[in-house]
Amino acid sequence: MSFYNHKEIEPKWQGYWAEHHTFKTGTDASKPKFYALDMFPYPSGAGLHVGHPEGYTATDILSRYKRAQGYNVLHPMGWDAFGLPAEQYAMDTGNDPAEFTAENIANFKRQINALGFSYDWDREVNTTDPNYYKWTQWIFTKLYEKGLAYEAEVPVNWVEELGTAIANEEVLPDGTSERGGYPVVRKPMRQWMLKITAYAERLLNDLDELDWSESIKDMQRNWIGKSTGANVTFKVKGTDKEFTVFTTRPDTLFGATFTVLAPEHELVDAITSTEQAEAVADYKHQASLKSDLARTDLAKEKTGVWTGAYAINPVNGKEIPIWIADYVLASYGTGAVMAVPAHDQRDWEFAKQFDLPIVEVLEGGNVEEAAYTEDGLHVNSDFLDGLNKEDAIAKIVACLEEKGCGQEKVTYRLRDWLFSRQRYWGEPIPIIHWEDGTSTAVPESELPLVLPVTKDIRPSGTGESPLANLTDWLEVTREDGVKGRRETNTMPQWAGSSWYYLRYIDPHNTEKLADEDLLKQWLPVDIYVGGAEHAVLHLLYARFWHKFLYDLGVVPTKEPFQKLFNQGMILGTSYRDHRGALVATDKVEKRDGSFFHVETGEELEQAPAKMSKSLKNVVNPDDVVEQYGADTLRVYEMFMGPLDASIAWSEEGLEGSRKFLDRVYRLITSKEIIAENNGALDKVYNETVKAVTEQIESLKFNTAIAQLMVFVNAANKEDKLYVDYAKGFIQLIAPFAPHLAEELWQTVAATGESISYVAWPTWDESKLVEDEIEIVVQIKGKVRAKLMVAKDLSREELQEIALADEKVKVEIDGKEIVKVISVPNKLVNIVVK
């Protein structure tokens, strides 16, 4: 057979690996460890798409490489299986979300195994398994005991169509929900919160210790949003009331000409005048219909209403109006701002809109035309006049502190984590509310608090989850006869994914989350590969929980993931019409190398776009494996380009990768394998071992494959192939194309055992030395010839060779040689006249 028969070979080796537990995690304490982690998937009904295997193949290459290098490798897989999609599907179809999820997991697992990934399935976790979420609930009870889980009446992002509140991070820029694209409104509700803000400074500072891309670290820094400034207290004229604003520029207080409160601010109703009451009430209602993102959009028209009240500027005693406006959020800072329109563009636009005063306090701009937002010396600022920014801030803060109306303050943009969901399909929150007004956590001995089975899973719409309908489960009685109700909210999908990497380390432990010695052995995760879309949410939450567990003494490291790598996106093929609108692939036909709209006949432009059901350009890996084989898919996705680049899917590229594997198969099965080394491939073989090793280490898989191709080309030019080089090459390609490598290994090594633990090949540095080198020959400073010569020739030998060259002879014929300058290994310069 002259080609790689993937339909026979791939199932054969997948069966072998499963039967022999080839990838069971090593436990030899004398070996170094390597923990390669994938972001575990949500098992959707659609199954895997070709984007999933890109990251999975990368960690699989590293895992196979490290096993061959003698490491104990932990390379697990599991399922992030709670969450809205399964519940939504169950409501739409009448199916049980647990059954639907189990079917999806079985399909995902089948697809993953068909791709030849070397996971240790003995460590599989599933966030919906009570034996798993027992420990999710345990972590929650510890947070509760430490005061880091608490209940609060807060304005939440309510999604009527989903029947639940969602976190700020789950609201899209257009004000709709990330899940489903439904409208989001603000609504006050009793919610469980996690005090992630208590860890803000540590979450910020410890980023410096991580091997993550700066772009991801910056996204987290910006989300945490540390600001240094001052709290300033404003008294409300004619009342005993006051409010505090946080500002990073207290030095501009003399330019504050009005203040703005969030519509939800607790003072609004108390200070609003009778004349303004109706307008304020209407505005508050309108603001409640908008998401935070929609309210804070810089481009939107400025809206607001005067309350009828005035504040007293603490530095000059001036009365300034108090407005409400939706761009101020009750959940951010103090829910109040001092407006300095001369030096803040949003305040300037607001002042212009409502004809409010603009007072310049920093020189350098024309504040009638626009806000001046650069630094400048202070003016119109009494005792601050003539000072720069730093000196003025120090002086004004000292003044405020002396007067008792302000103080230096550090704040964070980060808000506490909204942790409850009004849905069924999630981990029950292990809290009981007693009729005497107290609440207690469910004791550890009673965990897991199992999610009860019910067909009635539609949200109540009242703010309570469907669990509120299950009386037998809901109502409990204490030993002393006091009655109570279980918490009916469930945890968000982020809960189970915030610690799953710890459970992989000891997945069957019934006594604790994981054994301390095993956690010491395996943490931190050596490399974590997944999409950049999780930069803020999942990664920030996981870091928070990890730091909390570190404080409890459960985990031995401050950070969970030492190295993070975000793979790029695999784009689908799509088509655009003359208006730039995307056209679904089933509406396109190809004629004479061009693409046309089936219905209109318009010629279309081919363009890459994100794979989507609507464009009908999603590529199913099952189809690729059937036609080309898993190894082809693996090699193609790694050869497409740099791992972090977003690149369009190409059928031609897939065919090219398949042809390469066929060439590899023919090279090993057709070439005469010899026991004696004739030296012909010494240099290219050792170059290949070195390059592939170094490029796997640096995740440059595309260039590693390119070097493997160089070797195949060189080897095909020879009649015979040295057996050790054949073996070494098969080992080098094994992480990329493991099924093919296993099969070829048996043809040259015939051990009957897997290649997986055969020691990784090494290179001989002496074989990399160039025997020949190119020199240039110059005549009167101009290059006239380039010659290949033996390395390290003397000046005299170089001169002799250069003068004997036919081209050089022609150039110097009939001329007098004045001088010859020779530089070994570089050049010969002949001076003539």
Curated annotation (Swiss-Prot):
It is found in: Cytoplasm. This is Leucine--tRNA ligase. One of its GO terms (cellular component) is cytosol. A motif ('KMSKS' region) lies at residues 610-614. The keyword Ribonucleoprotein does not apply. One of its GO terms (biological process) is leucyl-tRNA aminoacylation. It comes from Streptococcus pneumoniae (strain P1031). It is an enzyme of class 6 (ligase).
